[in-house]
Swiss-Prot record:
Homology family: Belongs to the geminiviridae protein AC4/C4 family.
Keyword DNA-binding in annotation: no
One BP term from GO: symbiont-mediated suppression of host innate immune response
Protein name per UniProt: Protein AC4
Compositional bias segments (type: Polar residues): 12-30
Length: 121
């Protein structure tokens, strides 16, 4: 009883115009190798280039898939933000604790004389 009847040799063109089927024979083992290649136009989302199936001496299929990473990876919107929006600018307690700024001033004797003259006017 054959379980893998769908892997029998196919001759001619496939019903899908974008795929082609070819039958090769492995020289070392003599077992047939079936290769299905797709001719889809390459896009950013399409990663699958080739899909080939070879049969073991017992007649079981071995699936081999080849993948290619996209040429230009899509930038992550989470790791590269364009702008930061502060929703409630009046609530500064959420952003951090504000410290009071200490100011120190020194007055020289000449400044005291100026203040005296100004206060007498």
């Amino acid at each position: 009883m054959k379980l893998f009847r769908c892997f029998k040799p196919c001759r001619g063109q496939s019903s899908n115009p974008h795929t082609s089927e070819s039958q090769e024979r492995n020289i070392q083992t003599g077992s047939p190798i079936y290769t299905v290649s797709s001719n889809y136009q390459e896009s950013r989302t399409s990663r699958m280039l080739d899909f080939s199936t070879s049969l073991t001496p017992e007649g079981l299929p071995i699936f081999t898939q080849t993948f290619r990473q996209p040429k230009t990876p899509m930038p992550s919107r989470i790791t590269s933000p364009k702008m930061v929006i502060i929703v409630n600018p009046g609530s500064t307690r959420c952003l951090g604790v504000q410290r009071q700024i200490k100011t120190t001033s020194t007055t020289t004797p000449s400044m005291r004389d100026v203040w005296k003259r100004l206060s007498q006017l």
